Amino acid sequence: MKYVYTGLAALLTIALIVVLNIQLPVGNSKTPRLGYFLSPQQGFWQNAESDNTDFGGEIVLSGLKGKADVYFDNRLVPHIYADNDADAYFLQGYLHAKFRLFQMEFETNVAGGRLSELIGKDGLAIDKYFRRLGMVYAAENSLKVMEADPVVKSAMDAYTAGVNAYIAHLKPNQIPLEFKLLNATPEPWTNLRSALFLKFMSYDLTGQGDDDLLMTNTKNLLGYNMFQKLFPDRADSLDPILPIGTTFEKPSIVPKIPVNVDSVYYGISGGTSTAIPPVMPNKNNGSNNWAVSGSKTKSGRPILCNDPHLGLNLPSLWYEVQISTPTQNTYGATFPGAPCVIIGFN
């Protein structure tokens, strides 16, 4: 009988080893290996957070040029105090990575047409759309302009170094839970990723989606005259901002038309056309601002309000922070993925 028990125990052990090393299919993706995910040393248990997390202490980071301090208030908003701007942006990148690393990588993978690398075939249609939209090409060109300015380049380089400093200090058990769920690891951050994120925000804030492409197809179908009747450039009741007859010293920029206009929207290969489903931004997105004269306020001082029309996300699109250096003292909302304060005050 003891041989039966021994054999049974061996079979159960082998079965357990096999089960803990398989990846279960979920849609077109797979779960992480169960043994790794359930491991007390490296799995999701390590991502549990204590209610009494202590942010005190000192960290030595080789990328800093001088001494810097970060204080967290009772809402865990970080207040960065640095001897120079580069160190402040370095710490901003470090903090963004510490609290929002997966969000940063996920959003830039979407913009760069690499979502399927994280979630499998389910992201392929979105990847095709953003690649044919030319998001990476646009980000590369924007980055050239940004890095031509030494001040901007210094800020981006410092920010990127800060993000990578955090990633370099991550141990396997400290990788954010979302990466573990997708059986992925964080990639090194680059200035191009920051440019990609900013381009993605520009795309999201246009609120127009594929209107240009849809209108072009409609005009081709109905003809120019009928299209102008249905979709005039402006309503008759509106006066143009520029008076009729205004002339300009330089001609307007006329974009070059592709040899095959349809190739912008359709993936043409071997004489066949396959429509790419558009990824439509929210048409309610956008931003504006408003001001109140000092004569209408209790304090007698004017009020200027930035009013972004953006949805609620979890985690939030924004990350609140104060940046204080000898050349600036700003407080406000930042984008995880890019340096500086986007909306704030001095």
Task: Describe each region flagged by the PLM.
Residues K2-I303, P308-P315, T327-Q328, G332-T334, ...:
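Substrate-recognition/specificity elements adjacent to catalytic centers across diverse enzyme folds
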Residues E320:
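Carboxylate-rich, divalent-cation-coordinating active-site regions
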Residues S324:
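Core nucleotidyl-transferase/polymerase catalytic module
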